[in-house]
Structure formats: structure tokens, C-alpha cells
């Protein structure tokens, strides 16, 4: 018996016998919501999270908080964007997300809990066979989204009038470090910006602390901004 215990005892010293099972894929809801509400997607049995973006002076510029059901549906989502003076707070109610304060129906849902329509803006979303949002459209614009085999968002292309804005992301080849990525932004096929992010990860392969470098190449000379992202995540 003691010989059978040796491998496990060795593993305890090295990595631990009872390791957290890592989920490498992203759910359709998490990936799609991260595209629309501009936050880093998370993996695994997330119960609630807060993602905070801070500038070089340590000032908060953006914060996204969410609570999720065990099935992976967003029960609530709150976005505070100080740079654009935007506040959004949504709560799930059957087939809609309501404004958390006025209780006005804001977003209609499809399927289990996926985005379908934003009536006030005339925006509708389309999904693929796996439930990922791949298109958004209104009278003024059309957007297409791309994902890799694990559901990680690879970018989007937005067409409006005579302008085409494309963002293409390249994640790390290490599947554990998906949120280590570079991205390039093109406007009418002309490069106007790039992004690089590197993170530290928890046992669920989710980012805890990240450095985000954004370079605006649309101005001369180019302007570089450095941000810090901090995540607090609770799991089921």
C-alpha cells in the first residue's frame, strides 16, 4: 500500500493531488457578452466577477461586474465606463434584461439566455449553430464576430456607411493563457492601432492581474497608454 501512496505524496509536494479541473472553452454567452460589453471573457464555473481597468495614475476608468447562474447565464451585469460617461445595469427577467433601476425592458433574449435584440437602438443579433453571436445589425451598421475552436473571441469587423473597422486578435498559443494576446485595428485597411496584453492567472485559467498596452497609431507620433486590469472572481 505504501508504494501506491508514493506517486500521490510526490504529487502533493509538486503540484497537489487534488487539482482544480481547468475548463479551456468559453461558453457562447460569456464570449458573446464580452464582445458586446467589452470585457475579458472568463472560463469555468464563475459565480460572480468584477473586472476593473485602471490607468497609469491608478485611476479607475472602467468597471464591469456580473453575476451568473450555475448554467452560465448572466443574472445581472453592470458596466461603468468613466471615459465615455456610460453606466449600464441590467438584471435578468425571463426572456429580457431589464434596466436595474427603471425596470424597463432593454435587451430581448433568445435560446437559453443569449442576446437577440436591443429594441431601443434597432440592433438585432444572429447566432451560429453553437449559440455564439456572429452578427449584429441595424440600419446604420453591420458587425461580424470571429471565434477560435475554444470559443475565444478573435475580433470583429464593423461596417458603417463607407467605413470598415476591423479588429483582429491573436491569443497566446498556450491554451491556459488565452488572455495573453495581441490585436491590430484597421480602418479601411489602414492600420490605426494595436494592443498587447499579458496576465497572471488563477487555477481556473482566468486572468487575475493584467497589463494592457494600447497604442493609437491614428495620430503622429503614435500615443501609447498603459493600463492595469484587476479581476476578482468567485466560483461555484
Swiss-Prot record:
Domain of life per record: Bacteria
Cellular component, GO, one term: plasma membrane
Signal peptide segment: 1-16
Membrane topology designation: Lipid-anchor
UniProt keyword list: Cell membrane, Lipoprotein, Membrane, Palmitate, Signal
Entry similarity comment: Belongs to the UPF0257 family.
Name of the featured protein: UPF0257 lipoprotein YnfC
Organism: Escherichia coli (strain 55989 / EAEC)
Lineage: Bacteria, Pseudomonadati, Pseudomonadota, Gammaproteobacteria, Enterobacterales
Amino acid at each position: 500500500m505504501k508504494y501506491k501512496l508514493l506517486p500521490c505524496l510526490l504529487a502533493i509536494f509538486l503540484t497537489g493531488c487534488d487539482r482544480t479541473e481547468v475548463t479551456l472553452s468559453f461558453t457562447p454567452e460569456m464570449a458573446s457578452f464580452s464582445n458586446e460589453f467589452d470585457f475579458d471573457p472568463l472560463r469555468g464555473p464563475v459565480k460572480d466577477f468584477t473586472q476593473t481597468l485602471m490607468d497609469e495614475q491608478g485611476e479607475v476608468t472602467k468597471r464591469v461586474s456580473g453575476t451568473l447562474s450555475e448554467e452560465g447565464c448572466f443574472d445581472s451585469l453592470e458596466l461603468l465606463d468613466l471615459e465615455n460617461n456610460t453606466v449600464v445595469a441590467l438584471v435578468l427577467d425571463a426572456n429580457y434584461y431589464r434596466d436595474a433601476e427603471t425596470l424597463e425592458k432593454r435587451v430581448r433574449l433568445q435560446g437559453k439566455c443569449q442576446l437577440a435584440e436591443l429594441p431601443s437602438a434597432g440592433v438585432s443579433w444572429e447566432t451560429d449553430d453553437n449559440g455564439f453571436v456572429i452578427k449584429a445589425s441595424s440600419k446604420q451598421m453591420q458587425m461580424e464576430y470571429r471565434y477560435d475552436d475554444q470559443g475565444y473571441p478573435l475580433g470583429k469587423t464593423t461596417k458603417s456607411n463607407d467605413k470598415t473597422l476591423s479588429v483582429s486578435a491573436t491569443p497566446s498559443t498556450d491554451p491556459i493563457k488565452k488572455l495573453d494576446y495581441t490585436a491590430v485595428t484597421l480602418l479601411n485597411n489602414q492600420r490605426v492601432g494595436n494592443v498587447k496584453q499579458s496576465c497572471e492567472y488563477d487555477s481556473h485559467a482566468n486572468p487575475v492581474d493584467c497589463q494592457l498596452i494600447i497604442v493609437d497609431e491614428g495620430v503622429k507620433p503614435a500615443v501609447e497608454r498603459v493600463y492595469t486590469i484587476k479581476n476578482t472572481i468567485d466560483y461555484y
